[in-house]
């Protein structure tokens, strides 16, 4: 199921109707802009709703755990902002972490972040360096395998922080982080007592990514996410809404795909 990570990140940033794995263009609702937008020699197709089927149960939404629907299908990749991502060649590229320099011993990363681009959390609060420091400190405290060797984080100014590591693991950490380690809101989680993974408040799904959670129906086993705007960090969002529906079995899911009930699985 982790293959959806690349599908959803593509959906968030540059998905076209023809480029979606398993999509049935005739079944998709493409009632966004009336005409495709020319981009060089190719045109971008807008999709009003991309319907995704899964067999994973929709059991709440919490960006701090990989055990729920967000973690299992990596919806964190579109609800929150990954620090770094990988391109089609598997090479690490900047995202919310907009650039970095490594020390000679590979024990220090001096990184810049998109905290000056006017991004806000889905509840309207501004994204700041406090969120960056909070997120990395959380990963340190939890001894996250994605950030193995990370021992410290310190803000230098409003857009820059230094990350301290051991054993020259800078390259290893950047590769491990790609697509999976995302920014978390300090103003939400610093107030939560107990295990973050067990928190079920309405703000548990708040992110600053290109899509925000707008509805969860556990009884109907469906979930909807909507684009926050037409563009995100300078890139067009060609899919307006993501609808996720859970099916009881793989056979039922395949039938739904074949009948055009869903566009991807």
What do these predicted ranges mean?
Residues 46-56, 108-113, 135, 161-163, ...:
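Short, well-ordered beta-strand elements
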Residues 51-104, 206:
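N-terminal lobe/hinge region of extracytoplasmic solute-binding protein
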Residues 99-142, 156, 162:
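Aromatic- and charge-enriched surface segment that lines or borders ligand/interaction sites
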Residues 112, 147-190:
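Surface-exposed binding/hinge segments that line
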Residues 230-265:
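Ligand-site clamp/hinge motif
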């Amino acid at each position: 199921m982790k293959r959806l990570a690349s599908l959803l990140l593509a959906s968030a940033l540059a998905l076209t109707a023809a480029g979606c794995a398993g999509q049935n263009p005739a079944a998709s609702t493409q009632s966004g802009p009336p005409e495709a937008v020319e981009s060089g020699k190719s045109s971008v197709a807008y999709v009003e709703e991309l319907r995704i089927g899964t067999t994973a149960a929709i059991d709440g939404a919490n960006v701090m755990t990989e055990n729920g629907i967000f973690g299992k299908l990596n919806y964190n990749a579109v609800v929150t902002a990954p620090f770094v991502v990988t391109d089609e060649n598997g090479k690490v590229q900047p995202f919310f972490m907009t650039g970095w320099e490594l020390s000679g011993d590979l024990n220090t990363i001096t990184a810049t972040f998109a905290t000056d681009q006017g991004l806000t959390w889905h509840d309207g609060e501004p994204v700041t360096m406090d969120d960056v420091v909070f997120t990395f400190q959380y990963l340190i405290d939890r001894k996250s395998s994605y950030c193995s060797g990370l021992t410290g984080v310190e803000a230098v100014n409003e857009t820059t922080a230094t990350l301290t590591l051991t054993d020259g693991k800078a390259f290893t950490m950047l590769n491990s982080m790609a697509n999976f380690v995302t920014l978390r809101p300090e103003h939400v989680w610093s107030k939560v007592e107990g295990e973050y993974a067990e928190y079920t408040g309405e703000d548990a799904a708040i992110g600053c990514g290109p899509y925000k959670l707008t509805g969860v129906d556990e009884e109907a086993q469906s979930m909807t996410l909507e684009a926050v705007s037409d563009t995100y960090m300078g890139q067009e969002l060609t899919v307006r809404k993501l609808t996720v529906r859970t099916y009881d079995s793989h056979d039922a899911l395949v039938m739904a795909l074949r009948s055009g009930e869903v566009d991807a699985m």
